[in-house]
Amino acid sequence: MSVGSAVTPESVLYAQRQQRLMDAIELREPDRLPTILFSHFWVAHYSGMNCRQAMYDYEGLAAAMRKAVVDLEPDGFQPVHAVVAFGPTMDILDYKQLEWPGHKGLSDEMPFQYLDAEYMVPNEYEEYVLDPTGFMLHKYMPRVAGALEPLSQLPMYPGVLHTRIIQSMEAYARPEIRRALETLIKAGGEMQKMRAVQSRLIEELKVLGFPSAAHGTSHAPFDVAADYLRGSKGAMLDLFRNKDRLLSLMDRLTTLIPPAAISAAKAASGNMIFIPLHWGLDGFMSPKQFTTFFWPQFQKVLLTLIEAGLYPHVLWEGNCTSRLDVIKDVPPGKCVYFFERTDMFKAKEALRGTVCIRGNVPASMLITGAPSDVREYCKKLFDVVGDGGGFILDAGVGVPDEAKPENVLAMYRYSKECVY
């Protein structure tokens, strides 16, 4: 792919990097070991910004990301604004699902914190399955954003028809609903500002020869249930107390989840979808529970995305070594499995010829180790996991916030020595 109308050295590098990634993803040997840059707050720290500044200063974060990409020279990057730059919008919404730096006493130096809570009670399962959009509008959004509580008063439109639609307009004149709608407009304007900076940065990095490696996000159905609806306690109890309801919800989610990712990728003119997983790790579910409540539904999501021409990059957080023989059941050369603590050598043995493997330089090594430690670990990964291709070098869950710059530089620089 050329950048602009003329062939430039940067456009040649862009095409080479893009091809290097695709060769690895599609299980061919690239010219050398490819890398992707993914982080939350490390790129901000690398430029002297704290976490609060990263979440509120769109232009400053763009400059930090630009510096990190230029210095590290990865073959692809995941845009950082889409991960952290939500501070002003969350302020407007009075958002409830996170605490973030400078908000309610959290230090400016601390990353945002996820708040585990129940946002859908057990007797609402059927309501969500029957009318997910209505549930999200009337119940979920008012629960996760204080400024949107009045949306619970909106008309129940499936039962409001013909002239009653006209009569229902009265609801929008209520002061509290007007305030909620004005808040949505204000929040939308703020997100437009952030997206504009992000889009400009992606284009600038493209001109410099660096492709984006994430064009949308998606989820596993069980993670949606546990992270965003029932909460961890509710989801764990439902594995035993509400099995049929939980399975019904996840079957519904297999059709609800993919369209958002497909739409995002189309808007970004890209084909890589990032999927962080939280509940598929060893030790949480038994093998039988995993093959009942997690994998079949998630596999359907993956296959739908693949059929749409997309390449899922699945971040398997924690240790998932015991799942390898199950999760290898996907079309060859269409998925990337990004491992944190899974045994990479067993993963290569199980997934060779089927899935591209990404990872997994440990966070602890990047934070407390030395560049020589990093280089030695990367060499082991390249020699074994990189054998025959199908491997992308990265940190275990992306570059950790506290990683030493010299260790991060060592990882990315060493990859350029790994020639096939």
Language model features: what each stretch is:
Residues 1-420:
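Catalytic cores of TIM-barrel enzymes
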